[in-house]
Amino acid sequence: MDYLPLFADIRQRPVLVVGGGEVAARKVALLKKAGAIIKIVAKNIHPELQILQENHEIEWLAKSFSPEQLDHVFLVIAATNDSLLNQQIYQAAEQRHRLVNVVDDQQKCSFIFPSIVDRAPITLALSSAGTSPVLVRMLREKLEALLPQSLGKMAEIAGKWRPRIKEKLPAIKDRRLFWEKAFNGLFAHKVASGDWESAEKTLAEQLEKDNPKQGEIILVGAGPGDAGLLTLRGLQALQQADIVLYDYLVSPAVLEMIRRDAQKICVGKRAGHHSVAQEETNRRLIEWAQQGKKVVRLKGGDPFIFGRGGEELQAAKQASIPFQVVPGITAASGAAAYAGIPLTHRDYSQNVVFITGHCQKDGNGLDWATLARPHQTLVIYMGVMNAGKISEALIKHGRKADTPVAIIAHATLPNQQILNGRLDQLESLAKQAETPALLIIGEVGGLQSDLSWFSSKTDKEDTKSSLINLA
């Protein structure tokens, strides 16, 4: 171990910063967050420091450094570009046994700053002892993704309740089990939802009676396919799940992010055949949640856009099961972005409409006259099977036959397929398309050749998420 990790309490302790530039301003911001009394020595100070000085939040002690300035400080930071001055500060600090950090000169540091993940009062510090800053940054990125923002509030409430829990449960084993149950159960869910009053009520109820463990259902949008597009909240839910029920549309890369010992069950749905009836899926969700499991329902895209997520939550509500929703990037946004097709554009499309292509077999359930209006973009989910009927109806109601169209299959993935053409060619294009696929109809489709940027090479070699690399 090259450095001893310490967490220093510098609240109301004097800290000297020599230097007044941008680097010094960054160090001051960190010290200020930790509650230090900050003294600055510099000829001139950065505008951010000027504001702090005018507000009496820092003290501009002097314009030049002298060793005596170290006599009454806890630690010193040298943030200048003057190597001789930095050497002088380092030697003076060492002689007085003051902790010193010379920015970007590790040989003149008795301490170094770690990379920080801040969920106060939970704080994680990472360091490679200066050997690999990029690796530390990647590790921090992974931890930032895995640790929910609510973690700090959870710790704060837990600290408030510690004396009461200790009085009620004197045995350390009982207290450990109590907190494990709380941090993995309804209490954590309430804190994450921002319902702090209810979270404390849950702790009180858990303490006063031996409640059976209560599970919950988390509806998670997996996004359009690229695992890098999964939200941080979605990743956290997958890492906490006991059971995950997922659809065919969820990519293997996203499934790889599920906690290793979680049970994974495919309840896949595809146009034309349903492997598991919706009622059976609802029943399973409720049954496992009632057994105290944390059940994740993982859906491609966004669960509230043609995902039947509302139906599943209605069933959970009726069964009095706690639930939460983690939205995802819907297929329309992901497919269009990766294809280089802006869904709206000031010159071509003033609105965008999302519809499903198989809700009514005869097509009579849709207002084709409205859908056929010019200067709007239609995004059609599950429309490949009825592509001929769709193009016929739109042309019949006034949409021009030469309106650009695109069919995008396997959107955002290395095997993404894009078929471009005209509205009157939609049926023939659909016969060539792989599935699942999305239809985009509108003048914006004509921009695809100019704005296309994504390729399988781009995905594999340039933009692969470091979260996946470190998984």
Swiss-Prot record:
InterPro entries: 4pyrrol_Mease, 4pyrrol_Methylase_sf, 4pyrrole_Mease_sub1, 4pyrrole_Mease_sub2, CobA/CysG_C, NAD(P)-bd_dom_sf, Siro_Cobalamin_biosynth, Sirohaem_synt_dimer_dom_sf
Listed pathway(s): Cofactor biosynthesis; adenosylcobalamin biosynthesis; precorrin-2 from uroporphyrinogen III: step 1/1; Cofactor biosynthesis; adenosylcobalamin biosynthesis; sirohydrochlorin from precorrin-2: step 1/1; Porphyrin-containing compound metabolism; siroheme biosynthesis; precorrin-2 from uroporphyrinogen III: step 1/1; Porphyrin-containing compound metabolism; siroheme biosynthesis; siroheme from sirohydrochlorin: step 1/1
Residues binding NAD(+): 22-23, 43-44
Residue numbers spanned by region Uroporphyrinogen-III C-methyltransferase: 215-471
Residues covered by region (Precorrin-2 dehydrogenase /sirohydrochlorin ferrochelatase): 1-203
Annotated protein name in UniProt: Siroheme synthase
Active site: 247 (proton acceptor), 269 (proton donor)
Positions bound to S-adenosyl-L-methionine: 224, 300-302, 305, 330-331, 382, 411
Originating organism: Zymomonas mobilis subsp. mobilis (strain ATCC 31821 / ZM4 / CP4)
Residue ranges that the Swiss-Prot or TrEMBL entry lists as coiled coil: none
A single BP term in Gene Ontology: cobalamin biosynthetic process
Molecular function as annotated in GO: NAD binding; precorrin-2 dehydrogenase activity; sirohydrochlorin ferrochelatase activity; uroporphyrin-III C-methyltransferase activity
Keywords from the named record: Cobalamin biosynthesis, Lyase, Methyltransferase, Multifunctional enzyme, NAD, Oxidoreductase, Phosphoprotein, Porphyrin biosynthesis, S-adenosyl-L-methionine, Transferase
Function as written in the Swiss-Prot or TrEMBL entry: Then it catalyzes the NAD-dependent ring dehydrogenation of precorrin-2 to yield sirohydrochlorin. Finally, it catalyzes the ferrochelation of sirohydrochlorin to yield siroheme.
Catalytic activity: uroporphyrinogen III + 2 S-adenosyl-L-methionine = precorrin-2 + 2 S-adenosyl-L-homocysteine + H(+); precorrin-2 + NAD(+) = sirohydrochlorin + NADH + 2 H(+); siroheme + 2 H(+) = sirohydrochlorin + Fe(2+)
CDD domains per record: SUMT (cd11642)
